[in-house]
């Protein structure tokens, strides 16, 4: 197996005195989709947010262990968190377009990072919208408000906005749970296409979705990572009975 993109060693995470993650060890492979599954409150979203330090924004949290991105500990004191979040971006559960035009949503990140050339920005906007399978639907109305898009289009816009800053890793926290079935299918097709260029980690409550879109699956329960393997093995021949019980609907 190739060198992992992200390596997690003995990760523990605390909200105050509450230990939300317990000795998590995991290797996330590059150019693959890794799904995180488990019942509500199991720690999967907390774990996802440790991967680009979004939990830093919460008072009273602390962490032990290490998370290595291409061999570098992202919690080392010298790490630039803004630069980290450019490399490891997040797509949230509900679409959150900025109250500005479609064009300006996509150009927002590149402008922050110093790109001012109109020609360069035009190219980034077009490439990003094409990568997010949205260009054909919005090419004629780039100056219109992004808030006028449908929910599914808004979520693909948010993915395009993330791709515009050229991340290496894309984190997705239930990216289609607020969408209708047709929009969900488009997001799943997009995830499949994006893994050629990006490493993707997705939290989902939808077991069928995890089985459809992911190459690897990690099952979390009560803050522990119970089992991690290729998705086909997790869903057909899990080693741990707790995994089998969850997947077959005996609890969750």
From Swiss-Prot:
Stored Pfam families: ABC_tran
SMART domains named in the record: AAA
InterPro entries noted in UniProt: AAA+_ATPase, ABC_transporter-like_ATP-bd, ABC_transporter-like_CS, P-loop_NTPase, PstB-like
Domain ABC transporter: 6-247
Topology versus the membrane: Peripheral membrane protein
Keywords from the named record: ATP-binding, Cell membrane, Membrane, Nucleotide-binding, Phosphate transport, Translocase, Transport
Reactions catalysed: phosphate(out) + ATP + H2O = ADP + 2 phosphate(in) + H(+)
E.C. designation(s): 7.3.2.1
Translocase is among the record's keywords: yes
GO MF annotations in UniProt: ATP binding; ATP hydrolysis activity; ATPase-coupled phosphate ion transmembrane transporter activity
Coiled coil: none
Main EC class the enzyme belongs to: translocase
Record localization: Cell membrane
UniProt signal peptide: none
Major place of residence: membrane
NCBIfam families referenced in this protein's UniProt entry, alphabetically: 3a0107s01c2 (TIGR00972)
Reported function: Part of the ABC transporter complex PstSACB involved in phosphate import. Responsible for energy coupling to the transport system.
Protein family: Belongs to the ABC transporter superfamily. Phosphate importer (TC 3.A.1.7) family.
Subunit structure: The complex is composed of two ATP-binding proteins (PstB), two transmembrane proteins (PstC and PstA) and a solute-binding protein (PstS).
Matches recorded under PANTHER family: ABC TRANSPORTER I FAMILY MEMBER 17
Name of the protein in its database record: Phosphate import ATP-binding protein PstB
Organism: Moorella thermoacetica (strain ATCC 39073 / JCM 9320)
UniProt gene name: pstB
């Amino acid at each position: 197996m190739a060198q992992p993109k992200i390596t997690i060693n003995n990760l523990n995470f605390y909200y105050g005195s509450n230990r939300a993650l317990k000795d998590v060890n995991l290797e996330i492979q590059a150019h693959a989709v890794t799904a995180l599954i488990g019942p509500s409150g199991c720690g999967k979203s907390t774990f996802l947010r440790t991967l680009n330090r979004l939990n830093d924004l919460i008072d009273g949290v602390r962490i032990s262990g290490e998370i290595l991105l291409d061999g570098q500990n992202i919690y080392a004191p010298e790490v630039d968190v803004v630069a980290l979040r450019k490399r490891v971006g997040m797509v949230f559960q509900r679409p959150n377009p900025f109250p500005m035009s479609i064009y300006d949503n996509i150009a927002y990140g590149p402008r922050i990072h110093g790109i001012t050339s109109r020609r360069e920005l035009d190219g980034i906007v077009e490439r990003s919208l094409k990568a997010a399978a949205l260009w054909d639907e919005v090419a004629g109305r780039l100056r219109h408000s992004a808030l006028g898009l449908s929910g599914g289009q808004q979520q693909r816009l948010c993915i395009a906005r993330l791709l515009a800053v050229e991340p290496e890793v894309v984190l997705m926290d239930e990216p289609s749970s607020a969408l209708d079935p047709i929009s969900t299918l488009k997001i799943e097709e997009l995830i499949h296409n994006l893994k050629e260029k990006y490493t993707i980690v997705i939290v989902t409550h939808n077991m069928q979705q995890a089985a459809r879109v992911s190459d690897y699956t990690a099952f979390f329960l009560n803050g522990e990572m119970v089992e991690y393997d290729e998705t086909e093995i997790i869903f057909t021949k899990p080693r741990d009975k707790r995994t089998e019980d969850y997947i077959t609907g005996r609890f969750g």
